[in-house]
Amino acid sequence: MAVDNEKKRSTPDSLNSPHAKKSKPMQELSESGPLTQADVVYFQKEAIWRQMIQYKQQMMSMRSELIRLQRESDASKHIVTVLTAWYEQILALFDELNSEETSDLLLAITKNDDEQLDLIRKKLSNLISSKVTFDSAKYEKVSGELALLSRQNEQMTEEKRSLGERIDELESKITELAKEHERAQSKTLKRLDSQRHIKTEEDEQSTTKEENPQPNGHHKENDKTAVVDSEELDNLKCELDKLKTANQLLVQQVEQLTKENQSLIQKSLNLENKLHNLEESDLEDNTYYKKIVKNNQSLQEQIGKLTKLNSSNVSRLNELERQQNDLKSVIEGEIIEENEKLKQQLQESENNLVRIRTTRDELLSKNNILTSQLQDQKTNESLVELNNVLSKRVESLTEERLEAIVGTPGTGKLEDLSQQELIHKISQLNNEIKEVELAFKQTREITLKKLTSSIDQENLTKKLTIEKNKADQKYFSAMRVKDSLTNENKLLKAQIAKSQDLIKNLNDLEKKYLNKIDLLSNQLVDFRIIKENSLAENSKLHDELKTLNIAQDALHQEVERVNAKLESTLKEHTDLQESNKKRELELAKLQKQLQSTENILQKYKTNNTNSLLQEDEQQLEALRSIAKCSVCSKNWKDTAITVCGHVFCSKCTQERLAARLRRCPSCNRGFSANDLLSIHL
């Protein structure tokens, strides 16, 4: 990535420069001679390139791991969706929860709290256990298989963990080998190694030349070097003695370990024999076995007591239900009889009422007809009397008028009168008669009008009186009916009160019986809970026994593992013996190497010329210039600038960033904090 960035950033410079096609400086290693500054820069760039390749490999491995994890997460999401659909189908089949509860029970993919999952698991297990029938034989079989599978799962997890650790170790070894391989392929390191070999060969050649016989003048110098070499030889012999003593100690430790191993093997064999041939005495001494036996006995006693109580409670409940059914049948029969009697009485009273009403209406109609006839007769008589009175009054009025006009009639007066006077009086009488007739007609019309109005009023009064009589009769009949109904209502209320008292008494009895039934049902529930608890404890004890058996099997397997480990330790012991032999051989080789080194030291001390020292100092300074910072010349180079490839210490780069001098000290190229890369030379 740094090289790509360098290429991208160098494009505008390369376009503007006239010599763009030329190779970049400091990218070729010198083949011969001492190391130059260009070789140092090449070495730095090569180290940065190796580090970048390592980062790239890590990134590729992380990317492949991320793709694998994404696939696994997609598969797990698919499985979770399928399981949620199954749970929805199960809940729909059971149909015992509301929609809110089912939404709480369904799994959420975003969050997976262990407590919430345990609650959901318990709810679903209760639902499924309420619907699914329990088979003890299948349960025992499945529980045994589950225990075996759990044990196998634990073994597999342990093996997986150990394999994972081995894989991590192998990955670390592979990375180290890859680093060593890359370092072995680097040109600079090959160059340095070749220079070292050349120097050693030159030193050996010089020592062989100087080993030839010299004149007596150099005898004193050889004596001095021999004294120094003898001192170094003594030191090396002391170190050899130390190594021998350490080797003897290691041999003694190995012998002790073998003895302990043999004793452990014997103990393990004895324990294995005991485990295969367990006796009752061994189990009786065990506290867990005693507890299990005591718990089993107490549970059996509790189960016997609970069965007796359950049978007695069932018999009592049956008796109470029978008594309750008898009482209900008796009360229902009495209530039905009373209702039938009341219905008969109501029908008879209704029939009597209808009959009385019909007779009453007939009598009222007859009475009205008779009263109307009597009133008509009275009106006719009164009219006749009025007519007579009026005729008499008219006659009296005519006579009075004639007397006033003519006077009392007499023959002498009429005779004395002349004809004209008689005609005149007759005309006056005719006029008066006409006026009297008009007045009579008017009075007759007025009287007739008054008569008609009086007749109408009388008819209205008659109608009103008739209607009043009818209303009075209806009122009185209604009052009579009301009195009869009130009496009947009182009787019915008294009967209803009696029936209500009976119903209250029956309700009280029913409440008492229901309370007793509730108490008995609660006791039954408690007994069932106790029974379930006892069964659960019994199953737990069975499970504990199974777990003990499983533990026994696990112990057998552990014994087998211990035997396998013992075999492996024996193999390791043999390997250690072989390694000790190899070390002894290596010690012999080291002794030979010591002798050769002593000879080399003597030769080197005799031929320690100034020229070789100067060359060594130059090489050391060159290596120091490679490894130490060129700015401060104190700290080791550990950070590289990815823009230009130059390497400095982290302190100098951080000081430059803090002082805002963000340019490379060697090439004056700009950089930022993101362009820094930590390396190890």
From Swiss-Prot:
Gene name of the record: BRE1
A Pfam family the protein falls into: zf-C3HC4_2
Annotated region (Disordered), positions in chain: 1-32, 180-226
Protein name in the entry: E3 ubiquitin-protein ligase BRE1
Cell compartment(s), UniProt: Nucleus
Family stated for the protein in its record: Belongs to the BRE1 family.
Function: E3 ubiquitin-protein ligase that mediates monoubiquitination of histone H2B to form H2BK123ub1. H2BK123ub1 gives a specific tag for epigenetic transcriptional activation and is also a prerequisite for H3K4me and H3K79me formation.
InterPro entries, per the entry: E3_ubiquit_lig_Bre1, Znf_RING, Znf_RING/FYVE/PHD
Compositional bias annotation for Basic and acidic residues: 1-11
Keywords: Chromatin regulator, Coiled coil, Metal-binding, Nucleus, Transferase, Ubl conjugation pathway, Zinc, Zinc-finger
Zinc finger motifs (RING-type), residue ranges: 629-668
Reactions mediated catalytically: S-ubiquitinyl-[E2 ubiquitin-conjugating enzyme]-L-cysteine + [acceptor protein]-L-lysine = [E2 ubiquitin-conjugating enzyme]-L-cysteine + N(6)-ubiquitinyl-[acceptor protein]-L-lysine
GO BP terms: cellular response to starvation; filamentous growth; filamentous growth of a population of unicellular organisms in response to biotic stimulus; filamentous growth of a population of unicellular organisms in response to starvation; hyphal growth; protein ubiquitination
Molecular-function GO terms, alphabetical: histone H2B C-terminal K residue ubiquitin ligase activity; ubiquitin protein ligase activity; zinc ion binding
GO cellular component: HULC complex; nucleus
Taxonomic lineage from the root: Eukaryota, Fungi, Dikarya, Ascomycota, Saccharomycotina
EC number: 2.3.2.27
EC primary class: transferase
Key word Transcription regulation present: no
Residue ranges that the Swiss-Prot or TrEMBL entry lists as coiled coil: 50-77, 136-190, 224-446, 477-628
PANTHER family cross-referenced by the UniProt entry: E3 UBIQUITIN-PROTEIN LIGASE BRE1, RING FINGER PROTEIN-RELATED
Pathway(s) the chain acts in: Protein modification; protein ubiquitination
